[in-house]
Amino acid sequence: MAHTKTFLATGAAAVALAAAHQTALAQTSGAATGNMAEDVIIVTARRQNEVLSDVPASITVLSAETLERTGVNTADEFVQLTPGVTIVTGTAEAGDTQINIRGINGARDAESSVALVVDGILKTNTAQLNQDQGTLRQIEVLKGPQGALYGRNAAAGAIVLQTLKPGDVLEGGIEVSAAEDSTYRASAYVSTPLGEGIGLVLSGSYYTTDGFYRNDFLGSKTVDDQEIWSIDGRVVADIGPATELDVKARYADLSGASIAFNAAFHLPNFAGANPAFFEDVNDHPFNFYSNIRPTNDQKTFEASAKITHEFEAVTLTAWALYSDVDQSLTADGTSADFARFTFPAGTDASVAASNACFASTAALTGYPLNPPTFIGATPVPFIFDPANGSTFGPYSPTTCDGTQYQIREQSDISGEIRIASNGDEVFDWQLGLYYLHIDRKVGVSLGADLGQGIIRELYNAPGTSNPTTQLYYDDFSTDVYAAFGSVDFEVTPRFDLGLALRYDIEDRSVSSLVPVATDPFTGGPINPGQAFGPIPDQSQTFKQIQPKVSLRYAITDDVNFYANWGIGFKSGGFNNQGSAAIVDQAFNQFIGTNVLINDLYRKEKSSAFEAGIKGSALNGSLTFDLAGYYTKIDDMQFFEFFVGAFGLLRVVSNIDEVEVYGGEFNINAEIVEGWDLYGAINVTESEIKANASRPQTVGNKSPYTADYTINLGTQVVAPIAATFDMVLRADYRITGPTWFHTLQDDMNPTLFSGLLPGSALALPAFVGDADYSITRREAFGVMNLRFGFEGENWNVTAFAENLFNRKYLNEVITAAEFGGSFISPGGLRRLGVEVGYKF
């Protein structure tokens, strides 16, 4: 059955592409595979040097020339050139990045599903996925499970980056750009020899923008503004006739905004009073007006060393990496509609918060909010005071929402030693060992807004200006041990067989750092998990064998058939301790949702099969590849977001079983010298087969997975004079309809279902049920255009990002028991100019 689905999906993809063939052709990478017959692309994604056309897997490669002509710097940009891959990044904070490859998503607050490898070194912090990694020279995106090569965080694939390596001549470059919204970018690098056999690359970058959106209440562009700078250094030295030492260091600093969300309600039985209570997420008009300026800070430092020694028959490679990423955010809260700070509880802190809430509501009565929300004469929820009450929604201009302060701090030390045959043999092999230690602290603090701003401490006593009402704060420790090996055997000159195996052991533990303290607003502990005493430490070990089998058969000199199968693995882990108690008290006991959330979430395991053909024709002027795939995922990790009277809660849950299958087709044609047409289509089908956490979702699609992606484009390089060319580049990306939650065409009870029977409206519980059929992001297309002139060592380029100003959603986070979704807008049109010089 699995094979039938795979071949059906492959055929569907081919038919769909054929229909579009009259409009445009495609290319293997959606970006570049080199200048056809003239260039041979060498890739390293499988830990060995291979010709692109010989790799027995789906892989996208962006060369240095393509990176320069597309203006690509970070993952959110190169993902748009890669079929079957989507990304959500920066909606909550800069380090909040989720990459989805063929239906396998990296759940927020869990480990990534995609390995990030930079200059041969594996990085483990998801916060680094969308960072500028230096002066890039090649990007490779390898699809399908790569756990046998890279281990625990490569279930969906691997992103392999190569940066500039110093040579024996002085070279350098600078590039600056200016665009709308006060957006400026500058980058520079210099590569110089320091002596015989030793060289240095030093690079830096700077980026600033006011962003697309404005906070109307504060009167400032503080919704998606950002400022980033970074510096990278790399020294490569020959310390012996067969030994190379590669040392790198990097520092980056980011500051800007966070939590760029509005809320949309999905309560159909309220639509008679106001149609906006049942709002399609795609129709929402975005307005921002929180009274708290949202902030986001991120500091990154990392240093690594890699040594390579070539013996007569084998090569020894060893590396070590230290990485430290500290992140924090402040923002408005979400508690106004649940009256956490509305009524005094007999403490000075609660009286002060209630007074501030009533005063700010009275001062802002009638202030225009996104419908159906409104500010009435009092902050009492509308259902309890229909004549004078309010429906605020989250992030209102009043103080009734409270505040939030979050930290995510991770330091890790990792190392690997590997010995491999020297290649170009009938039988190649490699063996290695890997170790990783992670220290991670995660804190989420909710406080009362007394109109005096946020104190950047996780716990603030009741007498302060920002007293804490709820706190999750935990210390997570992880140790990973792995052994791996692979063999590649040339069975015949046309038939290659590869076998790989990796065994990972991951020891995880968690300790609560929440102090024993009383919540001045509820009288209970500040963490619900402390209701029956201190939260005990927990530990768990996760283990997984990850095999991989691949084969390649040369049908002709220009066409290869390939197939591969492998196991992917993501370790289980711990939510903030006390999460299960919150969900049980607030939802299961109150409205009977019976959603299953645990303080421990299970490991994710996937089994994936892929088969395809890739090749070239017309003396290399036409390249193509066609692939079909099938993946079965057990215990898929999924991010859930809860809001209520308790504040907000972020957790990872498990979907018991998901099936994904689909097809992908890429084609690239050089029409004449200097004119390329390219395009690609990916079609993905998915189905939830079992989900004990939310049984009604069985039959729905895998969350965060687009039904399809289409890439179309062209590049023209035409000589204008003897010394310079005109360059035109157009890239059009269509992303298909996407569900972001397991609840899709489903009804679900909400907190309103529990509150309405006892409210002033005295309505039956079902009136508060939500309908989530209107939470699917619709398909959208984004056109990026670049036009300019380039000489041997200079370029001037005008560019348009999202040329047609297509409005779309970046992310939809459904808060199922709240009765709505938190939605974040995508980028708008931005025009600019770029100038570069190299020597």
Language-model features and meaning:
Residues Y213-T222, I259-N291, D332-Y405, S445-Y473, ...:
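Solvent-exposed loop segments that connect transmembrane elements
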Residues D96, S112-S113, N125, G134-R137, ...:
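Outer-membrane beta-barrel translocator/receptor signature
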Residues V236-G240, I419-N422, D428, G432-L436, ...:
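Structural signature of Gram-negative outer-membrane beta-barrels, strongest in the C-terminal barrel
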Residues M1-V72, D76-T82, P241, A303, ...:
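N-terminal Sec signal peptide and the immediately downstream disordered periplasmic leader
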Residues D39, R733-S753, G788-F839:
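C-terminal beta-signal and adjacent terminal beta-strands/loops
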Residues S304-F311, T315-G333, A554, N560-G566, ...:
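Membrane-embedded beta-barrel scaffold of Gram-negative outer-membrane proteins
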Residues A37-V169, A611:
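Acidic, small-polar-rich N-terminal luminal/periplasmic segments of exported/outer-membrane proteins
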Residues R494, T623-I633, V651-L743, E834-K838:
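Gram-negative outer-membrane beta-barrel transporters
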